[in-house]
Design a protein with these regions (language model features):
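Active-site beta->alpha N-cap acidic-glycine motif
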Residues: 2-95, 99, 106, 113-114
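C-terminal domain-boundary segment and adjacent tail
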Residues: 10-23, 50-52, 66, 181-227
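A cross-domain feature marking catalytic cores of carbohydrate-active enzymes
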Residues: 32-34, 58-62, 84-86, 119-121, ...
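Conserved strand-to-helix beginnings and helix N-cap segments that scaffold or border functional pockets
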Residues: 41-42, 68-69, 97, 151-154, ...
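Generic structural signal for well-ordered alpha-helices
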Residues: 45, 69-73, 101-108, 129, ...
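Alpha-helical scaffold elements within enzyme catalytic domains, especially in hydrolases
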Residues: 47-50, 74, 131, 163, ...
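Glycine-enriched alpha-helix->loop->beta-strand junction motifs that scaffold or abut catalytic
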Residues: 52-54, 77-82, 133-141, 167
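His/Asp/Glu-enriched short active-site or ligand-binding loop at hydrolase and phosphoryl-transfer sites
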Residues: 123-164, 198-210
Length: 227
């Protein structure tokens, strides 16, 4: 599992791939995709608490949030950030711009207003990214845990995480059924390793407020209109 190629990074300048690091800062930014899950998400919350009351950003699917509103509430009560991962986990590559942006808005309505969006599978077209960037911060990553890959073990995931992590990294885990066997091993071991290596774990930093004049409202803004 490798970092995302730099050629992809340059496609859309407004997309966040990694948090710039300066001086002696050693922050790492943990993110969790595809939840909430009725067993795994509470377990992740507990792991983060046990390892130092750490904070993370959870990119939640609207359909899942509708099934488990109490978990969304618990995430926020614990000080974690809840962010948008679309309503139905659609790939931008195989979804029309209109449908993709509608999915974003439906998830936004389900979760309440959020300040970030992560495209499912990391698949988003430049037009979709530019349109959404007028409304929200589109966030990708530079380190994948690989916990979704059934051909890998939890140990494989941990080795990749240890090899690729650097100051400012945005790291992706998944609080999903598919990822569970690898997540359950890799996450606690990774948190121990981060502490040993002197890293500080954070939720993603606050984004600069977007001007009201550039916010997208369902395709009516000329700045946000796509294809």
């Amino acid at each position: 599992m490798t970092r995302t190629p730099q050629t992809v990074h340059s496609m859309v300048k407004s997309v966040l791939w990694r948090v710039p690091s300066s001086g002696t800062k050693t922050e790492v930014f943990l993110t969790f995709d595809d939840g909430p899950h009725p067993q795994l998400t509470p377990w992740v919350i507990e792991q983060l608490k046990e390892h130092g009351d750490l904070k993370a950003t959870f990119f939640c699917v609207g359909n899942q949030a509708a099934k488990h509103p109490e978990i969304i509430k618990n995430l926020r009560n614990a000080g974690h950030e809840v962010a948008n991962h679309s309503q139905g986990h659609e790939s931008g590559w195989s979804t029309s711009n209109k449908s993709y942006l509608r999915s974003y808005l439906e998830c936004e309505e389900e979760l309440g207003v959020t300040s970030r969006f992560r495209p499912p599978y990391g698949r988003i077209t430049p037009n979709q990214a530019r349109a959404l960037s007028t409304r929200t911060q589109v966030v990708m990553w530079d380190v994948l845990s690989g916990d979704f890959d059934r051909s890998r073990s939890g140990g494989d995931c941990l080795k990749s995480l240890q090899k690729l992590t650097r100051p400012g990294s945005i790291v992706v885990f998944h609080d999903s059924e598919k990822a569970a066997p690898r997540l359950l091993y890799a996450l606690p071991e990774y948190l121990k390793w981060l502490k040993k290596e002197g890293y500080t774990v954070q939720a993603l930093p606050e984004k600069t407020e977007i001007s009201q004049s550039t916010k997208w409202s369902g395709g009516h803004s000329s700045q946000a209109k796509v294809g």
